[in-house]
Amino acid sequence: MKQSVSAEQIELKSSLPGSKKVYVDGPREGMKVPMREIEQSETNGVPNPPIRVYDTSGPYTDPEYKVELEKGIPTPRHSWIMGRGDVEAYEGREVKPEDDGVKVASKHTPVFPQMDRQPLRAKQGANVTQMHYARNGIITSEMEYVAIREGVEPEFVRKEIAEGRAILPANINHPEAEPMIIGRNFHVKVNANIGNSAVSSSIAEEVEKMTWATRWGADTIMDLSTGKNIHTTREWIIRNAPVPVGTVPIYQALEKVNGIAEDLTWEVYRDTLIEQAEQGVDYFTIHAGVLLRYIPITAKRTTGIVSRGGSIMAQWCLFHHKENFLYTHFEEICEIMKQYDVSFSLGDGLRPGSIADANDEAQFSELETLGELTKIAWKHDVQVMIEGPGHVPMHLIKENMEKELDICQGAPFYTLGPLTTDIAPGYDHITSAIGAAMIGWFGTAMLCYVTPKEHLGLPNKDDVRTGVITYKIAAHAADLAKGHKTAHQRDDALSKARFEFRWRDQFNLSLDPERAMEYHDETLPAEGAKTAHFCSMCGPKFCSMRISHDIREYAKENDLETTEAIEKGMKEKAEEFKEAGSHLYQ
């Protein structure tokens, strides 16, 4: 009997406090671009305008939307894709039990009800990538949508994609995705990793993690499932994901050969690529830069090869003493990618796993190969981003960005942190956010989040929330440092609310309103404390902002500028001191 995953099984929350979902009409009929509007209260009768911010939460925060996971979410891109006239529906490959890592399909696996839908692919001789359209001077609906989200002109979006400086990951089989862009001249993006393992997690939990991560601001998610039900879990996630979904196909290919790396073949891997492309995966991490000649260089490392995909391919290369089949078949992979518009995320299989190994010969040798592969992908008009480290101390971070921009001709950089120290298990979301903020400032386009469970275990829901928020902080700090034209507006609004003691506005304007209110209410839970002109840190007598208010009020009453009021007040206090006898202690 077929099971199902219902909305009742998982926690789906509405919009954040003080916020509402709004839509901006696009230039094409029916195009509605989501935003989150944060309302603000008045200041002495003077209205404070609402603040609109980028929204990744999909329909789940729309009060008018009824969640039905078994049907999937709306498909805003479907008409755009079909309207271009360059795709066709076809039968697709047969879904087999081995796709879920089993020999016989289990009746207990919650099969997605619409698994029989026909996938799309490019018509014979066509190329359906956003890069292909951009290079041919076409501004697609997806590009127009992105331009509204980013606050730029559509032509700027087209040019950045055409030049390879940005990617718009948008598989034609993932029409549910709300278009977004990854590039250093746009907002810095954040990816959240989810996925089951052989020892933990269920399909319902992973769908919930996806909706949870996007609620807190994840711009993309990667399904890194390595346990059973990989295909089915991915189907549930993609059909309900409003953001692009990435995978590492070698993980599933390995499951198909019972976890024995040396039994992997190009044929098994190729079949897996097509399977996932038909489902709608938007970008693939492919470790094609792990070459046979680079593997011995890692022997002198402190932590060797720490990438799962990198170690799998290294083991295969050494066992067969052959070159990496992902490298030798790269042109064929490009042919598959452009049929579905799957973007490359060229994997850093030799990334450093400790600061002792940062910026070493193995890491930068692989980067040279990724630069070579980028040129090949671009020859096919396939979109590319480059994955980066890893564990890198602060003084070595900038070199990574400079080398990537030079070697990979400006392709977007997508980094895991980097972690800036190795001594803080349980706090690696912090050690990595330090590096993430720096490398984002230097030009990284997307940051892969790290949770407190990094190196320790599979993250739960709360870990996902902490990881996403931590990385949204790093990404926003980078946007501010780069001078993004709208980045400071939210900061300015929150600072004004803080100075005016509009506590609820402070909470609502923050990245995590619920956590901010929770911490405030631990010491001042009364409703009256939400309007008090102090908090529990300094109390009523020592609040610096309250004192600043008093100075301004004094200046106003005495018809003085604020600086004059301070000087006058200081003189008055000096006279009081003299009159009291000029004693330091009375």
Curated annotation (Swiss-Prot):
Biased composition (Basic and acidic residues): 22-33
InterPro entries: ThiC (IPR037509), ThiC-associated_dom (IPR025747), ThiC/Bza_core_dom (IPR038521), ThiC/BzaA/B (IPR002817)
Enzyme class: lyase
Binding site for Zn(2+): 391, 455
Keyword Manganese: no
Chain positions recorded as substrate binding sites: 193, 222, 251, 287, 307-309, 348-351, 387, 414
One Gene Ontology biological process: thiamine diphosphate biosynthetic process
Cysteine pairings via disulfide bonds: none
Gene symbol of the encoding locus: thiC
Family membership: Belongs to the ThiC family.
Reaction(s) this enzyme catalyzes, per UniProt: 5-amino-1-(5-phospho-beta-D-ribosyl)imidazole + S-adenosyl-L-methionine = 4-amino-2-methyl-5-(phosphooxymethyl)pyrimidine + CO + 5'-deoxyadenosine + formate + L-methionine + 3 H(+)
Presence of keyword Iron-sulfur: yes
Function: Catalyzes the synthesis of the hydroxymethylpyrimidine phosphate (HMP-P) moiety of thiamine from aminoimidazole ribotide (AIR) in a radical S-adenosyl-L-methionine (SAM)-dependent reaction.
Superkingdom classification of source: Bacteria
Keywords per UniProt: 4Fe-4S, Iron, Iron-sulfur, Lyase, Metal-binding, S-adenosyl-L-methionine, Thiamine biosynthesis, Zinc
CC terms in the record's Gene Ontology section: cytosol
Ranges where the record places region Disordered: 1-33
Name under which the protein is recorded: Phosphomethylpyrimidine synthase
Cofactor note: Binds 1 [4Fe-4S] cluster per subunit. The cluster is coordinated with 3 cysteines and an exchangeable S-adenosyl-L-methionine.
Pfam family, one: ThiC-associated
EC numbers: 4.1.99.17
Pathway(s) annotated for this protein in UniProt: Cofactor biosynthesis; thiamine diphosphate biosynthesis
Binding residues annotated for [4Fe-4S] cluster, in chain numbering: 535, 538, 543
Cofactor(s) recorded in Swiss-Prot or TrEMBL: [4Fe-4S] cluster
Molecular function terms from GO: 4 iron, 4 sulfur cluster binding; carbon-carbon lyase activity; zinc ion binding
